[in-house]
A protein has these predicted regions:
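Membrane-interface helix-loop junctions in multi-pass transport and translocation proteins
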Residues: 19-26, 93-103, 127-132, 138-173
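Membrane-interface helix-capping segments at transmembrane helix termini in multi-pass transporters
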Residues: 22-33, 59-71, 82-114, 154-161
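Residue-level recognition of pore/gate-forming positions within transmembrane alpha-helices
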Residues: 4, 8, 35-38, 81, ...
Length: 203
């Protein structure tokens, strides 16, 4: 509940400020790239969040099974993220060949796609690490808000804004990744162990 409130309040605060400060054309560029990024994200995560939350919840009392499920899903998500990110960066010229600003925004927002490798919030939720999730989210949102107010001061600061948003997302995932390593461990996984997961993840 607390995280949902944060997710409502902070976008209102930042959105109002940014819409007032940034050039409307540049802000429109940001939103356009954000729309394109939202197309790539599902392919990077491959449905791991929903499936992983349920799968870890079912085996959370068994350490060995938890480690195996975590490792399977992490490696699969990592593979999907690498493939998707490669396609994302390889095709950016197709979208904005003659617009340098859009290209820069596109490249910087690619950081969010790369960061999906460390997106393991489904493990924290399954293990009910709710206090950690709330405080981590609150601190990152506050730092993001302060950074926007401090550095986005001119109508041309769209790249700075994009960088702040992308690094905030990456930091959120990376912190969770290192936090969860106290609860789960990587185990050796064979490719054949991943095949049974494909259909459930696509469902």
């Amino acid at each position: 509940m607390g995280i949902r409130i944060l997710n409502i309040i902070f976008p209102i605060l930042t959105g109002t400020y940014v819409a007032r400060v940034l050039d409307k054309t540049y802000y429109g560029y940001f939103n356009s790239v954000d729309t394109i990024l939202s197309f790539f994200l599902p392919f990077a995560t491959f449905g791991v969040y929903t499936y992983g939350l349920r799968a870890i919840s079912n085996v959370r009392d068994n350490k060995n099974k938890t480690n195996k499920v975590f490792s399977q899903l992490f490696y699969l998500c990592m593979f999907c993220t690498i493939v998707t990110t490669t396609i994302y960066f390889a095709t950016y010229n197709l979208f904005f060949e003659n617009n340098p600003t859009l290209k820069k925004i596109y490249l910087v927002m690619g950081v969010q796609l790369v960061a999906q490798i460390f997106s393991i919030e489904w493990v924290n939720e399954a293990l009910e690490n709710y206090s950690f999730l709330f405080y981590k989210t609150a601190v990152i949102r506050v730092l993001m808000l302060i950074s926007i107010f401090a550095f986005v001061r001119d109508e041309h600061d769209i790249i700075i804004y994009t960088l702040i948003m992308s690094l905030s997302t990456a930091l959120n995932y990376v912190i969770s990744y290192f936090w969860i390593k106290k609860d789960v461990k990587f185990v050796r996984i064979k490719i054949r162990d991943l095949k049974p997961l494909i259909l459930p993840l696509l469902a």
